[in-house]
Amino acid sequence: MNEKTHRVLEFDKILDKLKGLTASELGRELVLELTPQTDYRVVEKMLSETNDGVSCIMRRGSPPLGGITDIRMSLKRLDMGGVLNPGELLRLAGVLRAARRLKGYINDKLDENNASVVKELISCLESNQRLEQKIDNCILSEDEIADNASPALSSIRRQIKEQQASIKDKLNSIIRSTKYQKYIQESVVTMRGDRYVIPVKQEHKGDIPGLVHDSSASGATLFIEPMAVVEANNSIKQLRVKEQTEIDRILAELSQDASLVLPQLNANMSIMARLDFIFAKSKLAIDYNCICPKINDTGKIIIKKGRHPLLDPKIVVPIDFWIGEKFSSLIVTGPNTGGKTVSLKTVGLFTLMMQSGLLVPANDGTEMSVFEKIYADIGDEQSIEQSLSTFSSHMKNIVDILSGVNNKSLILLDELGAGTDPTEGAALAMSILECLHQMGATTLATTHYSELKVYAISTTGVENASCEFDVETLRPTYRLLIGVPGKSNAFAISKRLGLTDDIIERSKEFLSQEDIRFEDILLSIEKNRSEAEKEKMRAESYRQEAERLKKDLEDQKRRLAAQKESELRKAREEARRILTDSKRQADELVSEMKRLAKEQEEAEVRRQTEELRQKLNKSINNLDDSLVESIMPRQGLVKPPKNLKPGDTVLIVNLNQKGTVLTLPDKNGEAQVQAGIMKINVHISNLKLVDEQKQQIQRTGMGKIGVSKAQNMSTEIDLRGMMLSEAVDVVDKYLDDASIAGMGGVTLIHGKGTGALRAGLHQHLKHNPHIKSFRLGKLGEGENGVTVVELK
């Protein structure tokens, strides 16, 4: 592909736009090297990387390309062992920063499973934040090294500042001194040759001892360094030398650190240049609303709503174009400024862009072919608006084309055969087209010659096309109509402009019958095409309406299905909820029934216990009645307690058992008394307050009952082999009897074993009202195998 083809198709202007979208000189260099490729696989890869860049920008926004500078010369110096200056090191740090930011641009969570050219390139970048930060911390600008770049540099600069302050103090004291003030030209401290001086009047140079470093333009002022600060200025100069030495050492150290990662830096430069180039192509595609076309190498081109990228997008008319299936040569006819050349250039420029890895401004469904050669004869330096070139210029270009054309070539010929005798020009044009067609080239030509229309109609593999012209408005519509030959429209245009019918009819008489018939055929074809297009548009409208109705019905069907599914889901959820509630209610009912059964069982137990208690009380009362006769003679000696009240501790005389008064005596003289675990009704005559017991104890004979009970009971009980529940019942009965018998203490034998019985008994004994305390047995008593209980 030659430079002339690029120029006439204005591909260089596309490259200029692309160059303006790069972020670095490295990217611009790659743009300048960009040329259309002829290898199908290479083109496919280039398009893929551009399309991938578009996807990245659409998902993540513009990439962080700032800081990509050309440091290749600095890297060469490092490779040769050189030391970089502060500016070079800052630019190197900027490149490292750019690499780090680019690595952060790709977020694996967004497309961790997707292969990506951009992602692969970025993953190959090497960041070195340690070196980047070290350079940034040490170097403030191209002319300034930070004080904290090293401890030595910080110390040197501190000493310099101290010396400078000391010198200024001394010089200011001289300036302010009444002794020297009259010799001073101006009360300022200034510098000459990096040394602090003061301005002294010329006539008093001998009055202030020192070194003269400079004088004013008039000679009236001498800049003198007083001897008092000469040594301090010398010290500063020496410190400056040390400062520069330390700075050189710091720069050498940073350069050495950078040289250790030289291979990574060189690789980063190449990768970032490539990324800048890819993203520039992607930005161009986004700016022009481009798509990635499907590609082939068979010569087939299908362009859907293609827009020439160099025309104003507000006025450009999209074209629909196809070639390479039923025909490989297309002849476009029609009036000038009708859009023929624009169509020609659009096809050619799209092909160059696609084969350079650039996306094309068209709609989805566009397909482009990869050609080995692209030739264009559109006149020297011709732009879209320029006039045609001369016949000789055309022929020279065509000769060059014919010498190199093959079946993988795209040929673009504008106004083929123009600039000479129409008859000869038409004959030459047909011969050239026939030659190109026989060679298998894909050819697109524009012409004014009617003979070429006939050639296209009569030749297999060749097709007519035209650019539509609106006779009513006398303006072209710029629409490309493939399959329809163009008309000159001279008579129609003339009539619209006011030419009389007589002249127009007379002019038609000069035409041959063949021309008239041909024009009539074209008119008929155009009329039929127009009607067919209207019918097509109407059919398309009906189709779209049918599609819309179909879509509406499908949407309605989906909505109904979704609604049905939703209702079923709600019904299932409601049924599930009802089942859950029913199960919960059933569980609650079962629990309630169990609770009621338990309460009923407990009530039955309480009833039986109460019956037993009543039987016991009846037995006790019977016992009281049977003993009345033997007791009464002795009771007569006992006085009933006076002012008896609930809570008083009394002795039940006939039982010799202590108790607590619960109620006041009733009309029968009986009070309810708590004796151990039993509540019994006792006549007040059978009660005695405890504090009166000692005075009256000898007068009663009831002690015989307790003594008799104690004589019949054992002081210990063996519980070994019993279950805890069984042992608890036995112990309660035993302790009741022991308490009634007035025993002071008893021993429970439970054995050692696992200790479970002992632990359970101890827990139960804590709540027994008869017990004062309890403990495990001591040595000789049975130790852990027994529990000794002290009763109240």
UniProtKB/Swiss-Prot annotation:
Task: List the Pfam families.
Answer: MSSS, MutS_V, Smr
Please state every residue range assigned to the domain named Smr.
Answer: 717-792
| Residues the entry annotates as binding ATP | 334-341
The UniProt entry's GO biological process terms, in alphabetical order, are:
mismatch repair; negative regulation of DNA recombination; rescue of stalled ribosome
Query: DNA-binding: present as a keyword of the record?
Result: yes
Question: What class does this enzyme belong to in the EC scheme?
Answer: hydrolase
Q: What is its EC number?
A: 3.1.-.-, 3.6.4.-
Keyword annotations of the record: ATP-binding, DNA-binding, Endonuclease, Hydrolase, Nuclease, Nucleotide-binding, RNA-binding, rRNA-binding
**A single Gene Ontology molecular function, please?**
ATP binding
rRNA-binding among keywords: yes
Q: Which domain of life is it from?
A: Bacteria
State the protein's purpose.
Answer: Endonuclease that is involved in the suppression of homologous recombination and thus may have a key role in the control of bacterial genetic diversity. Acts as a ribosome collision sensor, splitting the ribosome into its 2 subunits. Detects stalled/collided 70S ribosomes which it binds and splits by an ATP-hydrolysis driven conformational change. Acts upstream of the ribosome quality control system (RQC), a ribosome-associated complex that mediates the extraction of incompletely synthesized nascent chains from stalled ribosomes and their subsequent degradation. Probably generates substrates for RQC.
Say which family it is in.
Belongs to the DNA mismatch repair MutS family. MutS2 subfamily.
Its quaternary structure? Homodimer. Binds to stalled ribosomes, contacting rRNA.
Q: HAMAP family, from UniProt?
A: MutS2
What is the recorded name of this protein?
A: Endonuclease MutS2
Q: Which organism is it from?
A: Ruminiclostridium cellulolyticum (strain ATCC 35319 / DSM 5812 / JCM 6584 / H10)
